[in-house]
Amino acid sequence: MYMRDMEESAVLLGMVRYFGNDIKRISHAFKVYGFARAILSGERLPEEKALITALTAILHDIGIKEAVRKHHSSDSRFQEMEGPAVARSIMEGCGIHPHVMDRVCFITGHHHTYSKIDGPDFQILVEADFLVNIHEGYITPEAAPSVVKKYFRTSTGKDLAASLYGWANAGKSAL
């Protein structure tokens, strides 16, 4: 097993332990992680950026539990506020390098603030999260093509969206 795989596995287990029996949150994290890995395979990021992307996919919504506890809301601004501290705590327990933790925490703390996207690691996380949110019904089928057109930048993410949601037959112009 490669070091990146071991780090990802440790953080996945940390996320599962943190969420406990909250299968909805755990399942969402695994789906976003899966799509992020798929996009990563097509985009070929350097190893450290790939690790950051994968860890962020696992931990992007980790602030929900604290947001609900402290603010009685899972609103995105509270997730962004509470997420980085929880993410850092999980990663510290897994021996993740501080530089990697800092970047994961930055993205986790801004993952619904699309104007803050500043690199391919952040971009891929956003695309993977949107792919899952479309499937889970948080974005309507009518709104999905415009979301993809506005926010997707990677060719792999665009191709996945077109294939998954039936836009492939309509051609790339639908996106």
Mark where each language-model region is.
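Membrane-helix interface segments
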Residues: 47-49, 100
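His-Asp-centered metal-binding catalytic motifs of divalent-metal-dependent phosphohydrolases/nucleases
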Residues: 50-72, 83, 105-112, 129
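An active-site-proximal "capping" alpha-helix that borders the catalytic cofactor pocket
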Residues: 32-35, 77-93
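Amphipathic alpha-helix face/heptad-repeat signature
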Residues: 25-28, 79, 104
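Short helix-capping and hinge/turn segments at secondary-structure transitions, especially at repeat
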Residues: 41, 64-68, 88-92, 96, ...
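Divalent metal-dependent phosphate-bond-processing catalytic cores, especially two-metal-ion Mg2+/Mn2+ enzymes
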Residues: 2-3, 17-46, 59, 96, ...
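Active-site flanking loop/helix segments enriched in acidic
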Residues: 7-31, 63-73
